[in-house]
Design a protein with these regions (language model features):
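Glycine-rich hexapeptide-repeat left-handed beta-helix
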Residues: 3-116
Length: 116
């Protein structure tokens, strides 16, 4: 599902995903929608709560909030949630939940954006 003004312009694959208003997928970035072991997709909150949400689905890609920027050649693994106003560095492999207003550099470096 694409909301208004979504940009997926170059050699992307978006499978079974929701892309928010004015989100942008850089060249070659994909939303993977099936786990390699073919089990049901679970959304795992990798923040403090550690909550898990069972989707009951074998095919479930990613959910991107409004104004999300995904860098070139990034992979959003099944069940990834990227909250609004986030940036994902190029060549990233993202999984879990990325909180709003953050920059995903790699799995160990997810930093809050500085207010302007």
């Amino acid at each position: 599902v694409y909301k208004r003004q979504v940009q997926v312009p170059h050699y992307n694959y978006v499978g079974d995903s929701i892309l928010g208003y004015k989100s942008h997928m850089g060249a070659g970035s994909i939303t993977s929608n099936v786990k390699s072991d073919k089990t049901l997709v679970v959304v795992k909150d990798n923040r403090d709560s550690g909550e898990e949400i069972e989707t009951g689905l074998k095919k479930f890609g990613a959910m991107l909030g409004d104004h999300v920027e995904v860098g070139c050649n990034s992979v959003l693994n099944p069940g990834t949630v990227i909250c609004p106003n986030c940036n994902v560095y190029p060549l990233s492999s993202v999984r879990g939940v990325i909180p709003a207003n953050h920059i995903y550099k790699d799995a160990d470096h997810i930093v809050a954006k500085k207010e302007k």
